[in-house]
Amino acid sequence: MRQGTLHFFLFFGLIFGFTTLSLAQHSVARKWNEATLLAIRNDFARPTVHARNLFHTSVAMYDAWAAYDLTAQTFFLGKKIGNFTCNYIGIPTNFNVPAAREEAISYAMYRLLNHRFKGSPGASKTLPYIDSLFVALGYDGSFTSSNYSAGSAAALGNYIAQQLIAFGLQDGSNERNSYANTFYQPVNSPLVTKFAGNNMENPNRWQPLSLDVFIDQSGNVIPINTPLFLSPEWGNVTPFSLKSQDLTIFTRDNNQYWVYHDPGTPPQLSPDGSGTSAAYQWNFDLVSCWSAHLDPRDGVMWDISPGGIGNTGTLPKTFEEYKDFYKVVQGGVTQTGHPINPSTGKPYAPQMVPRGDYTRVLAEFWADGPSSETPPGHWFSIANYVADHPAHQRKFKGQGEELTSLEWDVKTYFILGGAMHDAAVTAWGIKGWYDYVRPVSAIRYMGTKGQSSDNKLSHFSAQGMQLVPGLIETVQPADTLSWAKGGDLGKVKVRAWRGPNYIPNPATTYAGVGWILAEGWWPYQRPTFVSPPFAGLISGHSTFSRTGAEVLTMLTGDAYFPGGMGEFVAKKNEYLKFEEGPSMDVIMQWATYRDASDQSSLSRIWGGIHPPADDIPGRMIGEKIGKAAFAFGEQYFSKTSTPTRDGLSDFQNMAVKVYPNPISSSTNQIKLEIPTTHPVLQFELINQQGAKLRTWKMDVDQFQAGFSLHEGGRLTPGVYYLRITGDGEQLTKKVVIVE
């Protein structure tokens, strides 16, 4: 290990028995967290489900610790979470508190992990490991009592697990039915990826992919070759700290989609090229252009040290700002790097590597697998290795006395787990509602249509790709490629990663970059995976990573990794799994947690599975989630504070329905469905500037029959907020008025 740096590994390809050393070195919470990550790596690749698993296991450990603390308060025991109340009468503390905490944590985790992973495809590895850890810690699995009233720590742990299991069976995840979707249906026919072309029905909506064989991101062979959308209804799951004021409930086909932190409609491709079509084309064209950066032989060298990259400034908000922020031709974004390592007081040493090595390592490093703990688990691994660094001090927010390793771990996991769960609920709620297209579908669709730059050229289509010299062009008679003849003349060709057909052996060959037909474009992924089986907007990586970066920054009180830099070494011709490479040792380096997050975001563009339109909203929303989850979670560390649980939760959980929404500016009536016992409710219509425009007081019969938003004058199209108040409770609903 270099002095002043941190090496951490995300455990790709980790083998059974990996924590032998940690048994002697780490807290009991850390041991069980490592067991959870092992279980996730051996399970199906489900970021939503595993963010929830990490949240629930973190709550189990935190409450088992807090139950014996004189200062902290529990999160779950004795509290109401969503519609679930966990009864708790307290436990005597007149005995060995450290031992009781370890015992309660271990029993809670043992029961919960066995429940969650008993049906896992890797159960033959996971369950024996959990058993061996439990026995190694000195506990008896035959003790199943949950009667903790006499002071049994084991019984308390069993009770916590029992209650969390019951909570999970009613939290909106549909765990009881293996998390199956209950109403979502795709609008597009599947794309058979091995054949060129794409004539999908709606270029703005997600398209299933049909593969010869589907291998998920954890390396599991799935017996269906057209995977279903993962968790499109996840916005309905009970969150950690999300607020009703940030919630919009949309309706499609009489089904509700709960969306927190609504980013608004992404760019849409219109038949005539109007509206936001140009933004759509630019976004997906950029993904194709960046695919040209995946060849280490192109002669382009980059300094990938923290002095050369990182320290990204203000994120773009408008389409014009996007075009300034992202560098379409050369790749990367506007960033200044860090001139000095604050830990050493010296400049960061340059690291010059081929751009094509950096981009490929980046894409695979942050990928979800195989043998991955998924993006939410990545940030637990990062948190664990930050805690292990010799320069790290276990001071909460960087202040006060050092905490014990157990207290540091349970508090870290509690806030990080809650934040990752909120990120999953938010990102997948947005994915389900907007149902946005992935690059492989969009690029092949536009490439099949033609080009939109010059209506005097052949193959013109308002829905085609925009030409970029040297990167997106049309096939000419002088082209000598084998496919550049006959019916291919005039079609759109792109300079891009050539795809899996050019990789006969991933261990010894790589595809490189060259001219291919746009209708046959591939993302930098395995042909057995191609793209994640869920919609694009918003990027889960961007959301999870920015959320995690904000939490670790606040938790440690320092934006920088311990020692001023985190590192990961990708060995020459060993690290890459999609194809041979890298051509030299590449050291991934980050000065700050946010730098790591930003690189995670960009990795998805070079990997060909997200455009900028997915990335930036994910970063912005992730920052909001991370900060809010931290502020919410830290309140539980003191009995003198009153955690501000969503005061609107009673209304929220009644699934208030406002329809039609969006509403036409010519529509007179809007209706609400609120299963409430309040005899009279107050309604206030507020604009985006916070001005109160209308106020009504109505009983149930009135608002269910419908009332006009336009009383007192016609409202202009835009976003408004309907604040509902009754008996001291409030709920705010977003209402969109359109032409």
Give the ranges of each region predicted by the language model:
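Acidic/polar surface patches and capping/hinge elements
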Residues: 25-645
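Generic alpha-helix initiation/capping and coil-helix boundary signal
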Residues: 10, 15-17, 150, 376, ...
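Generic low-complexity segments that are intrinsically disordered, proline-rich and/or Lys/Arg-biased
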Residues: 1-4, 8, 240, 340, ...
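C-terminal outer-membrane/trafficking sorting elements
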Residues: 15-20, 649-659, 664-739
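Hydrophobic alpha-helical segments, especially transmembrane helices
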Residues: 3, 8, 53, 542, ...
